[in-house]
Curated annotation (Swiss-Prot):
Belongs to the Tom5 family. It is found in: Mitochondrion outer membrane. Residues 2-30 are cytoplasmic. Forms part of the receptor complex that consists of at least 6 different proteins (TOM5, TOM6, TOM7, TOM20, TOM22/TOM9 and TOM40). A component of the complex responsible for the recognition and translocation of cytosolically synthesized mitochondrial preproteins. GO terms for biological process: protein transport. One of its GO terms (cellular component) is mitochondrion. The chain crosses the membrane at residues 31-48. Expressed in roots, flowers, young cotyledons and leaves. It comes from Arabidopsis thaliana (Mouse-ear cress). The keyword Mitochondrion applies. It is a single-pass membrane protein. Keywords: Membrane, Mitochondrion, Mitochondrion outer membrane, Protein transport, Transmembrane, Transmembrane helix, Transport. This is Mitochondrial import receptor subunit TOM5 homolog.
Amino acid sequence: MVNNVVSIEKMKALWHSEVHDEQKWAVNMKLLRALGMFAGGVVLMRSYGDLMGV
């Protein structure tokens, strides 16, 4: 069989360790929230940025 660089079992183990560990989950949620706020800010400025020009 072909040796994959990243096997399915390694991906499952990574997912399990990131989701089911409370400390890592809290950090991941903070990161996702920050990413969402950034993306929302970019969309807001692209949509309504011309109204903010002085």
